[in-house]
Design a protein with these regions (language model features):
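Conserved AdoMet/S-adenosylmethionine-binding subsite of the radical SAM
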Residues: 1-166
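Auxiliary Fe-S-binding modules of radical SAM enzymes
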Residues: 117-233
Length: 233
């Protein structure tokens, strides 16, 4: 399996003209590798035909990242990314194409995306799209020391009260240092996440999800070759 998108978005706006991702997928398809993609972008659907070819021969898994069910908030938090509606469309299109999906929820931003209503809405989208599982790395956000100034400036743009509210989540002496901001709703969110995913049959174990995304499958092994398989006709 070839992993794509673990460090950066494989479908930025420039991909519309450059077609680098499509050409890469065509090479993966030609040499019959499997692929596991992580994205936030509906632009992936442009290459759905290639992904379907890969899925027929080997294995294709797509991991879609969801942050909020609120369109207005999504536009402010991720202005360069696909909208909430577009990500729903992406998940449903992959479902209809028979391509398995996993969803990563997050980051969970205190006072922004940490409401029970938001989590319920996102999980409902996952159930509707028949995703295999949901990965959630905690009920808060970790901030490295070097990123604190920029992060807090962004919080201030969203609401002047947010920086002070975030500082109140930290123990004394941790402001400006690497720290985790745990949502005040963490306990309630954890309970809702656990009961809802169990009731819906969504896999949440990180190791199982890792194995699912990385497992290669040769769907054509054992097939009888024909004379025409030997030639590029």
């Amino acid at each position: 399996m070839i992993m794509v998108g673990s460090a950066s978005e494989p479908y930025p706006k420039e991909e519309e003209e450059l077609l680098l991702m499509r050409r890469s997928l065509e090479v993966i398809d030609r040499f019959e590798f499997g692929v596991s993609l992580r994205t936030k972008s509906i632009r992936l659907l442009r290459d759905l035909d290639v992904l379907e070819n890969i899925q027929r021969k080997t294995r294709c898994v797509v991991e879609v990242m969801l942050t909020t069910a609120d369109e207005a908030l999504s536009a402010r938090l991720e202005p360069a990314e696909s909208t909430v509606a577009e990500r729903r469309q992406l998940l449903k299109a992959l479902r209809d194409a028979g391509i398995p999906t996993v969803v990563t929820l997050g980051p969970v931003l205190p006072y922004l995306t940490d409401s029970l209503e938001n989590l319920q809405a996102l999980l409902a989208d996952c159930v509707d799209a028949k995703v295999y599982g949901v990965l959630l790395n905690g009920f808060g956000v970790t901030l490295r020391a070097g990123a604190s100034a920029y992060f807090f400036s962004c919080l201030r743009e969203l609401s002047p009260e947010l920086p002070e509210a975030y500082e109140a989540l930290l123990p004394p002496g941790k402001v400006g240092k690497t720290a985790s901001f745990l949502s005040p709703n963490a306990a309630a969110l954890a309970e809702l996440f656990g009961t809802s995913t169990a009731a819906c049959g969504l896999v949440t174990d990180p190791e199982e999800l890792f194995a699912f995304r990385h497992a290669f499958q040769d769907r054509r092994s054992g097939q009888q070759l024909s004379l025409f398989d030997l030639y590029d006709l």
